[in-house]
From Swiss-Prot:
Tissue: Widely expressed.
Key word Signal present: no
GO MF annotation terms: MAP-kinase scaffold activity; ribosome binding; structural constituent of ribosome; translation regulator activity
Protein's name in the database: Small ribosomal subunit protein RACK1y
InterPro entries linked: G-protein_beta_WD-40_rep, RACK1-like, WD40/YVTN_repeat-like_dom_sf, WD40_repeat_CS, WD40_repeat_dom_sf, WD40_rpt
Protein family: Belongs to the WD repeat G protein beta family. Ribosomal protein RACK1 subfamily.
Effect of disrupting the coding gene: No visible phenotype under normal growth condition.
Pfam families per the UniProt record, alphabetical: WD40 (PF00400)
SUPFAM superfamilies membership: WD40 repeat-like
């Protein structure tokens, strides 16, 4: 019996592209999403056929597109980054913005929490990476002189707490690996022929995967700083994520969501959306725009148990895929 993914349902409330999806570590029935509609939504998952979840709270305050959102490990706070140049911390119980992080001079493209939630990292079009504490104080800035020569599109902490590490991806076509303790560069990973949109670190912190314009995913050994192998995605990659419990890597591309088994390096799934079938199932509501519009996935995240894949699209709809056997 092979494992595959089937469309379980959709979630509609955003009115523009879904830029990021955050799932809780305790696998509770909520997710948080960000969008170009300038809002962040806290969803309650109902897991019903027509609508997989309902918008419980919409958080507004950013004055431009919200590009990224992540959750604290206790699930009480969301952290967002926006093209307005700011980060915000949100109390999910009240929906209030409790803190603003001001310092970047251009759009914030990516944010992350350290595993203990005590540190925050952000990446920006101003070509810097900033390290903050939760009080909103910037503790360190990695500037262009030491760092990336172009926009920094994505930044992530490694889950490996024994070797505290930050990984960043940039439009300068490189991935950089930083020592978190002193913010010094450990490795520069070069090999892409186009700008990078995304980098993901494996659950054990041993690997990272990067992707962007050239449509090729490169897998790297983080400890050694070496390229391991490449996977052909075939079109621009917008988001990458590792499964929490299977040796799978997922890519959101402009053609489909493609999933590889990293042991065999074979494609397990190639998920495409059937808008016509979807419209029939959901009484004709297909998000924004007309039905002939080409839509694609821009954000991805697994549930903590690895059984559900949440995918956010350019039409503002979140499509939910579940593991099935056939």
């Amino acid at each position: 019996m092979a494992e595959g993914l089937v469309l379980k349902g959709t979630m509609c409330a955003h009115t523009d592209m879904v830029t990021a999806i955050a799932t809780p570590v305790d696998n509770s029935d909520v997710i948080v999403t960000s969008s170009r509609d300038k809002s962040i939504i806290l969803w309650k998952l109902t897991k019903e056929d027509k609508s997989y979840g309902v918008a419980q709270r919409r958080m507004t305050g950013h004055s431009h597109f919200v590009q990224d959102v992540v959750l604290s490990s206790d699930g009480q706070f969301a952290l967002s980054g926006s093209w307005d140049g700011e980060l915000r911390l949100w109390d999910l119980a009240t929906g209030e913005s409790t803190r603003r992080f001001v310092g970047h001079t251009k759009d914030v493209l990516s944010v992350a929490f350290s595993t203990d939630n005590r540190q925050i990292v952000s990446a920006s079009r101003d070509r810097t990476i900033k390290l903050w504490n939760t009080l909103g104080e910037c503790k360190y800035t990695i500037s262009e002189a030491d760092g990336h020569k172009e926009w920094v599109s994505c930044v992530r902490f490694s889950p490996n707490t024994l070797v505290p590490t930050i990984v960043s991806a940039s439009w300068d076509k490189t991935v950089k690996v930083w020592n978190l303790q002193n913010c010094k560069l450990r490795n520069t990973l070069a090999g892409h022929s186009g700008y990078l949109n995304t980098v993901a670190v494996s659950p054990d912190g041993s690997l990272c995967a990067s992707g962007g314009k050239d449509g090729v995913i490169l897998l790297w050994d983080l400890a050694e700083g070496k390229k391991l192998y490449s996977l052909e995605a075939g079109s621009i990659i917008h988001s990458l994520c590792f499964s929490p419990n299977r040796y799978w890597l997922c890519a959101a591309t402009e053609n489909s969501i493609r999933i590889w088994d990293l042991e065999s390096k074979s494609v397990v799934e190639d998920l495409k959306v059937d808008l016509k079938a979807e419209a029939e199932k959901t009484d004709g509501s297909t998000g924004i725009g007309n039905k002939t519009k080409v839509i694609y996935c821009t954000s991805l995240n697994w549930s903590a148990d690895g059984n559900t894949l949440f995918s956010g699209y350019t039409d503002g709809v979140i499509r939910v895929w579940g593991i099935g056997r056939y």
